[in-house]
């Protein structure tokens, strides 16, 4: 179906998932047969910067796409090493090569594209993998997950009230499915403890 790549790779943290991530993944789905999401910070203890596990974040992503989209999306946890560390680059190459072999078993020369915002300083890693094409996406309405976490934490983690300012804000930046999942997560004891910890930082 006229795809420009066999596999599009998007490195993200999705703490939590929002419309910006979704727009990038939709663009990737339009251009590649398979979309491989590498979820960073995957084996970290919960913290104000990483409140959600990779399983919880994968559930947010899955809940935001149709069955057809999900059938072409692979989500793989990525260990955190400092971004400029050669070990991090190796981890990504190994994960991408392994998953590409699995997704395209008969393909001796699969085309791989890295997806990101080249204008965004956090995406300088696009330049770290010159052997892959790049699919450049605009930063969707300037949304970032730091602002979402900040809003939730500033509300003391309470996102139960549909009329509250924090829920109105969340509706403008993420899917209803993610908000429902977040509601379940924000009352978990270990997530409540992260919200408490954040108050003292």
Question: Across the structure, where does each feature detected by a protein language model lie?
Answer:
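Nucleotidyltransferase catalytic core that binds NTPs
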Residues: 1-200
């Amino acid at each position: 179906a006229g795809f420009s790549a066999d596999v599009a790779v998007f490195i993200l943290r999705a703490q939590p998932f929002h419309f910006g991530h979704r727009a990038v993944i939709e663009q990737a789905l339009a251009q590649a047969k398979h979309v491989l999401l590498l979820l960073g910070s995957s084996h970290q203890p919960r913290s104000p910067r990483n409140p959600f596990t990779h399983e919880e974040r994968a559930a947010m992503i899955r809940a935001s796409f149709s069955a057809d989209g999900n059938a072409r999306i692979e989500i793989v946890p990525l260990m955190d090493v400092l971004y400029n560390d050669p070990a991090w680059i190796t981890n990504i190459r190994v994960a991408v090569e392994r998953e590409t072999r699995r997704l395209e078993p008969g393909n001796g020369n699969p085309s791989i594209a890295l997806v990101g915002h080249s204008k965004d300083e956090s995406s300088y890693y696009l330049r770290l993998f010159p052997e892959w094409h790049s699919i450049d996406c605009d930063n969707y309405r300037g949304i970032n997950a730091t602002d979402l976490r900040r809003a939730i934490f500033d509300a003391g983690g309470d996102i139960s009230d549909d009329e509250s300012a924090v829920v109105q804000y969340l509706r403008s930046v993420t899917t209803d499915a993610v908000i429902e999942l977040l509601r379940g997560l924000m009352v978990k004891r270990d997530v409540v403890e992260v919200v408490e910890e954040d108050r003292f930082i």
